[in-house]
Amino acid sequence: EEGLDVITLNKLKLSDATAPNLEQWNNFLEQHKNPKSEIKIGLIGKYVELQDSYKSILESFIHAGAENKVKVKVISIHSEYINTGNIAEKLKGLHGIVVAPGFGERGIEGKIEAVRYARENKLPYLGICLGMQMAVIEYARNVLHLEGANSTEMNQDTPHPVIDLMDEQKSITNKGGTMRLGAWECDLEKNSIVWGVYNSENIEERHRHRYEYNDEYRTQLEEAGLKATGINPKTGLVEIVEIPTHPWFVGVQYHPEYKSTVANPHPLFVAFVKAALDHSENN
């Protein structure tokens, strides 16, 4: 309105530049500013006091909220302060739960409790990276009753290492050399939740992690109801788990938040927000 754009273009000798098409941006602003309803999502993490720690996830919820014409109110909950005695109070009133990425042992028992709460109470659940691994551990402990099931990142002596380093990683002493980084392919199981979310049989997503789903436990987990529905075609590594009998329960080893934009909200966040909205309207 003030004409600053014209002045800038003239100064840069770009006055003949084509006017940008702002229709998509304006549509986003309209839907973001005028939501039809509000939902509450619990973000379970151990760095919640540092708001920028989960900036990409928070931005992804803005994108997905606008796409669903709903305001997403994210409630940050420190996983270190969650236990069996207070979890119902801590997570009361939420319409969905996200367990955030992270490294190290601190706060993981609270994350595992949050997974259990979402699973047992039929709350929409999205586990990202470590959040996917916590879902596997929770299922192994509480459904398969594998006492002490854990990741070798947290307990190298666990009797049931359902999350572990791959064999070829174990001899590498430089930690940076064991990281799985960048874009990796993933084949999706037909008729799974994620197959419907992506509307595709093959995707490519970005990774930043070290430990993996231990395939030695895959048969037990799948027979008990936790399905591996996303597999890397070259390595056979499990990238996605879900519970088909749950309204919406998905854990992904990768980071969908890295690819979400205003113009292209990530379909996983869009679908999760839609599931949380459905939960808010039907419960």
Please give the residue ranges for each predicted region.
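N-terminal beta1-alpha1 cap of cysteine-dependent amidohydrolase-like domains
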Residues: 1-202, 207-245, 253-283
